[in-house]
Design a protein with these regions (language model features):
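Short, contiguous alpha-helical
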Residues: 40-51, 59-106, 146-194
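Hydrophobic alpha-helical core bundles mediating ligand binding, dimerization, or RNAP-core interactions
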Residues: 43, 47, 54, 124, ...
Length: 194
């Protein structure tokens, strides 16, 4: 796939130019950003919102779940960082051991014991920092490499796995916010203003 000096595909360039021509994208909007830079910027923006929601969880809410069999609030916090760590290792190190356990044995096999709110929030930050550092150091020309595990029927590009980390976090952040709203938490001010 052809890429320009910024790492953008021809299709991506054409799309940006098309929308800018018709006035839908302001001049200069993300033009000097390659896929790696986009991921890093998006990752930080996603985490900023997650910090707002995760910071609302109180210790007495960690074990709450909406129904039997659902993840608890604490398990959701833990799942976000545990899965991010596993996905990052798969993408950037080619280590699919997280999925070798997770897929056949289920989430419980990789989740581990939930800690305190403070411990889970610290792990969210630790893993986030590790992901940013590793993604920043990973050469842009390798972002199209595939990670393959025939036994698990996995065939994904590095960039797809990494962008999936962000989508996964957004999904579970919304789930956690739903839990908190059920428990009577107010909508965070930053969200209410929108």
């Amino acid at each position: 796939m052809a890429r320009d000096a910024m790492g953008r595909t021809t299709e991506c360039q054409d799309s940006i130019l098309h929308y800018r021509k018709f006035g839908r994208i302001p001049e200069g909007y993300n033009l000097p950003m390659n896929l790696q830079e986009f991921f890093l910027k998006q990752k930080e923006a996603v985490r900023q919102r997650t910090r707002q929601v995760a910071g609302m969880v109180r210790p007495e809410q960690m074990s709450w779940r909406p129904e039997a069999g659902a993840l608890s609030a604490g398990q959701l916090l833990r799942h976000i960082w545990v899965s991010e760590q596993g996905a990052r290792k798969a993408a950037l190190e080619g280590d699919l051991s997280y999925y070798e356990t997770r897929i056949p044995k289920g989430l419980g096999a990789v989740l581990g014991q939930v800690g305190t709110v403070e411990e889970e929030l610290a792990n969210l930050e630790r893993v986030h920092g590790e992901t940013l550092e590793a993604a920043r150091a990973f050469p842009l020309e390798r972002w199209d490499e595939e990670r393959i595990h025939e036994g698990l029927n996995i065939r994904r590009k590095v960039c797809v796995i990494l962008l999936g980390i962000n989508e996964h976090e957004i999904h579970h952040r919304a789930q956690l916010m739903t839990y908190l709203r059920i428990l009577g938490a107010p909508v965070p001010e930053a969200i209410r203003r929108r």
